[in-house]
Structure formats: C-alpha cells, structure tokens
Amino acid sequence: MSGEPSVRLVQQSDYQFAIYYNEERDPIYGDEPPPLGRSQGATPSQFLLAGVANCLSDSLLFALRKFKQNPEPIETKASCEIGRNSENRLRILAIHVEIHIGVPGHTLENLDRVLAQFQDFCTVSSSVSLGIPVNVTVIDSDNTKLYPTN
C-alpha cells in the first residue's frame, strides 16, 4: 500500500546510514557509537525512543485539542534501560517517557479524561509496549506530576 509508512536506508560508511523518510527531503542519519561507528547520527535505540516519545506527545496534544485546550509548548524526554536477556543479548528492557506541558494542569478542561485515554491512541507506544514496558509521566508547567496520579 502506498499509504503505509516506509523508510529507505542507504549505507554511507560502516554503520552510518542515510534514512529517507520522504524522498523529497534531505535524509536523517543513523549511526552507532564507537567502536562500531562514529556517532554521526542517532542510534537505533534513539530512533525507537523518538518514535515512542513523538507519538505519545502527538496523542496527548491531539486529545487536548479535541477539547479545544492548548497545552503548548510541549517538551518530551525519553530514556531507556538496556540490559541483557537470558541469552546474554542486549535488549531494551524498559522505556521511560516524561512529557512536560507548557501550562498549569488545572487550567486544562477535561484533563483527567484525556490523561486516562491518550496512550490508547498512540499507535507506536501501544505497539512497542506489547514487548517493552513503556512508562509515561506527564508534568505541567508548575512541575506538578499529573500522570500517573499515584
């Protein structure tokens, strides 16, 4: 299907690849850190984190805008735990995403409803979380933790 997401990778040197997500735009680059690569691009783990974090940020923004709420600016940070599995192979064991919204949470209508549902509409994190735990935190401009509420 032509509407399905796709990318094209072209090896540049060693482990560095040009990644074309749109043939009409310049590529972004992926690479491995030394000793395999030269850190001339994001690592595959960083691309995974970016995909999860971007999708969750989009989903939260979309859900709030549905109620005509403006949480901007949004800044999201993502990190992961990497460890070895039972076969001693490196794996991403967990992903942590922290979404910071640019306004106090108490100024946003329907926030509780949005926070209870927005992750369910994130295609990437919902898919990734089938194999890797994805832990999400939402914090407002007053540095109040809005989600999870425990």
Spans of model-derived segments:
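Extended beta-strand/beta-hairpin segments
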Residues: 1-50, 61-150
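Alpha-helical metal-binding/catalytic segments enriched in His/Glu/Asp
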Residues: 55-56
